[in-house]
Amino acid sequence: MRTAQKLESPTFLQWVRAPQQARSRAALNALLDAAERLVSERGFEETSVTDITETARTSVGSFYRRFKDKRGLLQALHERFCADARATADVALDPTRWADATANEMVDAIARFLVDIVRERRGLARAFLVSGASDPVVRERDVLLSDYLTDRLAACLESHRSELAHDDLRLAARITLLLLTSTLSHAAVLGPAELDIDDPVSATELSRAACRYLGSELPTDSNR
């Protein structure tokens, strides 16, 4: 019963895969799934093409028929990640989802969800950040994704305007996302010596910072 109640709660957020063409993309997705898992765990430079193909149960030749090199693979991973992030935002940042929640409950859940996403994919987040510094395609996708997430979060904040201390909620949404994602990206690159995102206290304090910026406080049961 508790599991069912948790799944029904608006604060229970999950990563969503964007729709795929099952058969035509099966082999490609096997490579991308393997690469995403390995890069998330080990990092991009530490993951070899052989590691990826062995995990995907395919051949090195099959890899190079699809990608010129590992950088081409990273491009494909980033493209899929951005599509999945949009699909996830459509669910997680749907204002109707939060109709019966308070603003601080909503912001707390979203902040913790972002921590979970980066914690589970820290090697991938690090690779995307480094790639975006020199790859204009990755950088442009990041900008478009940021705009999309900002619009979605702004719509959620708009439905709780009376609880918040901002007039320009789109700007508030952008700064909230920058506060969270920039801190988490920094942690992904520099590791636990800078900020230990495996420590639940880090998630609590990031959530507190986001809530207070928006003029709210943490939910009373959120100091966990």
Regions found by a protein language model. Give the residues of each.
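Short hydrophobic clusters on alpha-helical segments that form packing/core surfaces
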Residues: 31-39, 85, 114, 180, ...
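Hydrophobic alpha-helical bundle segments that form small-molecule/ligand-binding pockets
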Residues: 91-100, 120-126, 131-136, 146-173, ...
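Alpha-helical DNA-contacting segments of helix-turn-helix folds
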Residues: 74-81, 132, 149
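Generic hydrophobic, amphipathic alpha-helix propensity
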Residues: 26-35, 52, 77-89
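Helix-turn-helix
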Residues: 30, 38-72
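Hydrophobic/aromatic-rich alpha-helical bundle segments in the mid-to-C-terminal region
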Residues: 126, 139, 159-208, 220-224
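N-terminal intrinsically disordered/low-complexity leader segments
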Residues: 1-26, 218-224
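Hydrophobic alpha-helical connector segments
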Residues: 76, 90-119, 173-176, 203
